[in-house]
A protein has these predicted regions:
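C-terminal output helix
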Residues: 104-113
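Active-site beta3 strand of CheY-like receiver
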Residues: 44-50
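Two-component/phosphorelay signaling modules centered on CheY-like receiver
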Residues: 11-29
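Acidic catalytic/metal-coordinating carboxylates
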Residues: 32-36, 59-62, 83
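Receiver (REC) domain active-site loop signature in two-component systems and cognate sites
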Residues: 55
Length: 155
């Protein structure tokens, strides 16, 4: 179960998305602008953000940058009702995990959310795996020396 923040200035999105995403087993927070979204993001343990790209005052790309300043590991999915190659490229270059066009196909949204959360969980395990590698590298000389000593003792 993940905590997902949905940010959009469209009331329909803020009403539809939570009920659908809740059915998938996730908790949903909503915000109608970037400033409220940042407050929620800082107050709660948010695992993933779905945000509109065009919003008044703070657009989705500005919100993306601020979220990345706080937590570089948090996936952000960008929504737009005005698709263009340039906006998709800009969003991806800015660090968005994915880019979806409105009206959103909910099967596609579910898939993108699941893939982004899986990627985030894999990234969380990297420091542990690096530590495990170091532990193995450090322990190999110890076991070699111990093996040599035991071999000499058993002769």
């Amino acid at each position: 179960m993940a905590n997902i923040l949905v940010v959009d200035d469209e009331k329909d999105i803020l009403e539809q998305f939570p009920s659908i995403i809740n059915r998938w087993g996730h908790n949903v927070f909503t915000a109608s602008n970037g400033f409220d979204a940042l407050q929620i993001f800082e107050k709660h343990d948010v695992d993933l953000v779905v945000t509109d790209i065009r919003m008044p005052d703070m657009d989705g790309l500005q919100l993306l940058q601020k979220i990345q300043d706080i937590d570089k590991q948090c996936p952000v999915l960008i929504l737009t009702g005005y698709p263009s190659d340039d906006s998709a490229i800009e969003a991806m270059h800015s660090g968005a995990d994915d880019y979806l066009v409105k009206p959103v196909n909910f099967d596609e949204l579910k898939l993108r959310i699941e893939k982004s959360l899986e990627r985030k969980n894999r990234m969380k395990s990297i420091p542990f795996l690096k530590g495990l590698n170091w532990a193995l590298l450090i322990s190999i000389p110890f076991w070699l020396i111990l093996g040599i000593i035991l071999a000499k003792l058993l002769r």
